[in-house]
Amino acid sequence: MVLEMNTKENVLNHLKEYGFVVIPNYWSPEKCKQALNELKTLPNQVFEGGQGGDLRCQHSNKYLSSSNEFLNDSFIQNIADDYSLCNIADRVVAGIVNYNSDLQTDSGGGWHVDSELPAQLKSFMYLTDVNEENGPFMFVQKSRDLVNELQKHSNLRISQELVNEHVNSEDIIEMVAPAGTCILADSTYLHRGKQIESGTRYTYTTYFYEG
């Protein structure tokens, strides 16, 4: 579901109906390049390994002005305030997913939900172009009720077998989009980062929690 970013009401309505919204051209290509150059200055020691084998700087907003700007984005904050009680922008995680032919790597460690709260917003910024092969964000629309019926294992993960059995393929949205695309998603819905097959994916992700 792709929207123009200028209508808060439309964004909220689609978020509530489908669980996600894709906002194109939220940042310019130049702004993304600046953010990417900033991100690449971070020392290795500020990164940790994610569950899917990706690299994550948990509080990149403390180091990078572009990340801090994304954390304090007023439009996204207004959406968060109206969407759920999880409206405190806690941190921006700078994420890097690198292809390695010897490893199976993704962001998130397979299908999962972030919590079992009634609703919880997360915002993503693609800093580079994301295609079918370099680990796009994947999301199961309208899956909130379904999630409650599925067995979960370590850290609210849901097996691929259960997804294959219970999820209609047309409800799985693979978010291929250029740099500058902003994605708002309810992380209590089923989602994952696709396993990377080539290249590198760079993103910012803002995590929202209850106050």
Model-based region annotation:
Residues S101, V140-V147, F208-G211:
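Short edge-strand/loop segments of extracellular domains
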